[in-house]
Amino acid sequence: MGNSINLSILIPLIPMGMALFILILLVSFNRTINRLTKPVSFLLVFSLLVSALISSYLYLKKIEGELFLSNYVKVFESKNLALHINSLNEKIIICFTLIISIGIGVLFFKLPRQKGYVTLLIVISLISSSIIFALMFLDFSVLI
């Protein structure tokens, strides 16, 4: 169980990492990346769905607990920041990532894919990963 709970750190980091990777590519190859809207959309949706898959794995295996960030990042050694992993958090994260993935799919089909489209997707992915981090910092089990 200890190793499985360590997977939970990847839930917000996968979409954030993919968005930052595409942002670096956008800055480096601006014209080319703006033309590649289909692969960018696919990669961002795929990263969100992988996060939902990890969340559903943790939910189905009934893995709960806290993951202290001081174990991973030395900056947080003096702080007691912890990611809370419980069934309610996992349900919320699964629903949220699926809704954002569907939203990106709707944007793909409805919006004209012009110059700011890739930037919009990067911003949506960064905001969604920040919200996932915030959801994991909150302990919803005390509300029940």
Give the location of each predicted region:
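Hydrophobic alpha-helical membrane segments of integral membrane proteins
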Residues: 10-15, 91, 133-144
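Well-ordered mid-protein domain cores that form the structural environment of catalytic cofactors
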Residues: 122-129
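Short, well-ordered loop/turn elements at secondary-structure boundaries
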Residues: 87-88, 128, 138-139
